[in-house]
Amino acid sequence: MTDKRKDGSGKLLYCSFCGKSQHEVRKLIAGPSVYICDECVDLCNDIIREEIKEVSPHRERSALPTPHEIRHHLDDYVIGQEPAKKVLAVAVYNHYKRLRNGDTSNGIELGKSNILLIGPTGSGKTLLAETLARFLDVPFTMADATTLTEAGYVGEDVENIIQKLLQKCDYDVQKAQRGIVYIDEIDKISRKSDNPSITRDVSGEGVQQALLKLIEGTIAAVPPQGGRKHPQQEFLQVDTSKILFICGGAFAGLDKVIGQRVNTGSGIGFGATVKGESEKATEGELLLQAEPEDLIKFGLIPEFIGRLPVVATLSELSEDALIQILKEPKNALTKQYQALFNLEGVELEFREEALNAIARKAMKRKTGARGLRSIVEGALLDTMYDLPSMDSVDKVVIDESVIAGQSKPLLIYGKPEAQASGE
């Protein structure tokens, strides 16, 4: 066969593994005295992929972090919200322990516990879900509940959520079935009243009904990569009972619903118990007392609430917490901008009074941690625009007056001898 693999004119080349000639395959790759065809390359890739799939479950089983380890990792990235972190750590640990033991333990079937996060805008709901998925090294996708509609109506079908998850892991069904799905703005699909309506509510109660089976566990048929381009391909079957669903929402007004229930026994008229301002529960304290009946009154259907048995409440972030968020986490906002300026060879300093001013401004806007970036971006915009065109800037200092818009950042120049010689 050696004479057939020579590169002389008129000589046919053959694959050293399967023996097919260069005319029988699409591509023949040459190596030192050997050749391999594209078909053999594909076969080798398939064999390697299968071996990786067989080995990976054992590696994951021994690497499952404990609730304490999960909580400790969340502390590195999320400031405050201690009760919510504890609830999440236990729920996530139990979920993946269940998956690693095949949904059963001593013949007892273990149910799935999806999670509902209740908390104001910018309190860290999305960040908690993202951090969990990154730490556990599982596929993660987000969906906005306000874009979802029932199948057959204009909008996004609920099964598109699973397709997005598959896209994140290159359509590997086994990986997708270990993933985490975060559905944001879940409070926006509450029905208009707590009484069943005879009219069709395709973006409220209708979406809740459509999400029921998906969250509880069903076999979702998802078109393969390419979708309608290859209609002859079989649909991918994804078991959603193995996917952890985390739903989050601000639930504005839920505190009033809880307050009505909690204060029912205070009476009216001369027998009423009058509470002073200091005795009244804050919004955060009321949300901690949320019960399924309150969520039903808010507009979630009982069946939907039943699929989200684990409820974690996040409180509104205080000014001190916002200051901590600016400087303490591993990926703190100030550290991100300092790294960005370092790429220009410039040191960036935020003075303590500047951090206080940023936090106060975010508190006034009522946007929580989410509003911090826009405030810092606004303060640094002109500097980031000019800096790449400037020479000899060693340091940029941000103080309170910069955040208030009363002055520009202080630029400290270096190399005075170079400037003097240039003159």
From Swiss-Prot:
Keywords: ATP-binding, Chaperone, Metal-binding, Nucleotide-binding, Zinc. Coiled coil: none annotated. GO terms for molecular function: ATP binding; ATP hydrolysis activity; ATP-dependent protein folding chaperone; protein dimerization activity; unfolded protein binding; zinc ion binding. Pfam families: AAA_2, ClpB_D2-small, zf-C4_ClpX. Residues 2-56 form the ClpX-type ZB domain. Disulfide bonds: none annotated. Belongs to the ClpX chaperone family. This is ATP-dependent Clp protease ATP-binding subunit ClpX. The lineage of its organism: Bacteria, Pseudomonadati, Pseudomonadota, Gammaproteobacteria, Enterobacterales.
